[in-house]
Amino acid sequence: MAALLWGAPLTAQAQCRLALVLALDVSASVDAEEYDLQRLGLAAALDAPDVRDAILRGQNGSVALAVFEWSGRFQQDLHLDWTLLQSHADIDRAVLALGNISRSFEGYPTSVGQALGYAASLLKRGPACDRRVIDMSGDGINNYGYGPAEAYRHFPLRDVQVNGLVILGDDAEVEAFYRREVIRGPGAFVELSAGFEGFRAAMTRKLFREINDMMLGHADAPRLSPHG
């Protein structure tokens, strides 16, 4: 699928506080129903009022977003190229695009290291922002190709925060794998989803936290409303 670029154009003058890459697992363990829950859950999370408010409320620049799907060694597909989210209309277009994407790959293994490498390449050519974050979502451990450790050695990820959204299911080791090998950087965290059914709520929590990360811990930090 061709990458989509909407929203405000990325210019050298545009002030950006956060460059956020969302990496979605579409490996063989994700069936068609689970894929739809993930796809629609992401769109709904980005559309959540609290997340919208967090994106648009920032006083120190905009949020830039890129989204890709990943699976095996050579299976990475960009669905939303770098887009500045500076208005509700920008967010509306991104939500519409993400809600209507088609699955890129089926039946391939789980290559977390390669996905991190691809995310690093996106950040390298992306906007210059105050913070750079990769949001890795997955339901399994690395089972093909090089792992996260090799990716961190060979790609320019030194100043990048990598967080994880773990989809709990049949693989009992996936949470420990993400905590031990995937997340990286000061303040990095793992968000848990109770199966794919919980993906929407987990992604909403995760986006809200990542976008507000510079304020968390302060007395006046924003809080996610009970309904997201």
Each model region followed by its residue ranges:
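Von Willebrand factor A/integrin I-like adhesion domains
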Residues: A172-G217
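Bacterial N-terminal signal peptides
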Residues: M1-A8
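VWA/integrin I-like adhesion module and closely mimicked acidic/polar interface patches used
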Residues: I55, G140-E181
